[in-house]
């Protein structure tokens, strides 16, 4: 009988892997511009070049038994510090959007249980001030973003990590009538 190679991981069959249930949040200010954050630690996860160019809208997992709308408001507060009382949900995606992780992350991220994420998107109108944003969360939450800004929706496709681009294309198309025009 041969010895098992402890350094080899079992082959992952992508077709057997599920998508992680998740929400995405589009926050619009009074000028219909979109809140985006630059990924903290992007060099190790989303940005192998380390040039810090990957930005995204808030997103995160849906907890067991949690409604997607509640998850959207929770994730918004965890990642941006924006309180649910400062926003109003004005739209919800008509479908769930999916993306697959790149091969080097599949089987590693989220305990190796998911091939990617399946996201329900919400558009929120922000009625607060920029000073209401706090991207340094209270423990035990990790910092998601190291910078933030308001952007025109047509900037986003050039700023998002490539493996999420198709989701952003779909979301931006679905909600195009809500965004500021240049």
Question: Residue spans of the language-model regions?
Answer:
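Short amphipathic alpha-helical patches
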Residues: 42, 99-103, 145, 172, ...
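Short, glycine/charged-enriched secondary-structure capping and boundary segments
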Residues: 41-42, 51, 104, 138, ...
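Residue-level marker of positions within ordered structural domains that often coincide
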Residues: 30, 127, 173
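Unchanged
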Residues: 60-162
């Amino acid at each position: 009988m041969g010895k098992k190679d402890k350094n080899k991981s079992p082959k992952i069959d992508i077709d057997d892997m599920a998508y992680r249930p998740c929400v995405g949040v589009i926050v619009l200010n009074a000028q219909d511009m979109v809140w985006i954050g630059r990924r903290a630690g992007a060099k190790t996860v989303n940005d192998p070049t380390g040039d810090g160019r990957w930005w995204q809208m808030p997103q995160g997992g849906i907890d067991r038994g949690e409604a997607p709308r509640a998850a959207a408001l929770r994730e918004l507060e965890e990642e941006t510090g924006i309180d649910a009382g400062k926003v109003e949900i004005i739209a919800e995606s008509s479908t769930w959007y999916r993306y697959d992780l790149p091969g080097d992350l599949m089987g590693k991220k989220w305990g190796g249980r998911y091939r990617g994420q399946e996201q329900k998107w919400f558009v929120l109108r922000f009625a607060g001030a920029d000073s209401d944003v706090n991207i340094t969360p209270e423990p035990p939450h990790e910092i998601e973003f190291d910078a933030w800004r308001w952007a025109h929706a047509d900037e986003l496709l050039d700023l998002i990590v490539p493996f999420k681009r198709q989701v952003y294309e779909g979301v931006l198309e679905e909600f195009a009538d809500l965004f500021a025009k240049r």
